[in-house]
Amino acid sequence: RGVFDVLGRAAIALNTSVGDILSRTDIFAHGTTASTNALIQRKGARVGVLFTAGFEDTLVIARGPIGRVGGLPQSQAMDFIHTEPPEPIVPRDMVRGVTERVGSDGAIVSPLDETALRNAIEDLVENGAESLAVCLLWAFRNPAHEQRIGDICQEVAPGIPVSLSHQIAPKMGEFERAVTTVINAYIGPLTQAYIGDLDQGLSSDGLANPIQVITSTGGAARAATIGRQAVSVVNSGPVGGLVAARFLGDQLGHDKIITADMGGTSFDVGLIDGDTLEEDPRPFLDHGLPVALPAVKLVTIGAGGGSIAWTDGYRLHVGPQSAGADPGPAAYGRGGTEPTVTDALVVCGIVDPDNFFSGGYKLDPALSERAISSRIGEPLGMNLHEAAAGILE
């Protein structure tokens, strides 16, 4: 929706039509945080995971303390005693072990038990698996067993997407490879649906060529491949902003730039120092979720304009859940009743309700006030402005 809204406003500004703009467009590159938001809010697909038997707890054991504090701000990571374990994206009851074994040299030590495998796949599907991830020991040395499992998954559960670790992250590091593969399975269906709908909509409006999707490394990939490599486009929106900022900096003669990208769910900060973008070889996409794929370095927190403020009766919290764009903040007047960061900005006078989105959309301050007072102020014994200021702090 946001993409088409922007195209519509551009067409008005240029005194032309969206169709005319798209018909004259050779390359349409799109960056998105749809997959990032799904990961932060834990709103991805229900994933079933297949590990080598005996290693079913890889995601839980993680890599010791790194798996517990990785991805947290340094101040929290140093306070190890008071940190909470990261919220898993796959519940333990959706993990199964597969009898097989490949050695570190790639030699097959134990054959694959296909009968037990079929039973495990059927069990995961019966338990609601919408996507499957396969991560076997040393599969990047010899992918034969993973390839066979992929074939059997298609036989037993046709139509359910399968992510194989030797295809997603063929690198040493069992935990990171597993996390990367599981994340791909977790956000793959949503990302594919989003990109597919966007591509179809733009094509219907006159775009002749398939869209390209910005990747986490600052490059671009064809839309048709994104469903199979969804993890490669996490944070592609902010990364696209960094690429654009570098280009703009070149035009203006600046090579030291800090970028900030605030959306509905997250706030992303990037740094440009010179002509190159800093790369993180194994970034954390969220608390406890390192991936074995390089990416342009960003710092992301789960707080954006649509992040919902809530209370447990004792303390005020913000996020990670977001009201998104629809219904959005209460001030949008689209039926949203939860107080958000945007509502707090309206109440505190930081956002002008009459000039939101360059005056293209008017906000309703009364709805913001009602949401903050009823959900935050009254439960915590705070007046309206104290509650709004508390949300922003």
Go through each PLM region and give its residues.
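N-terminally biased helix-coil "hinge/interface" segments that flank
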Residues: 1-393
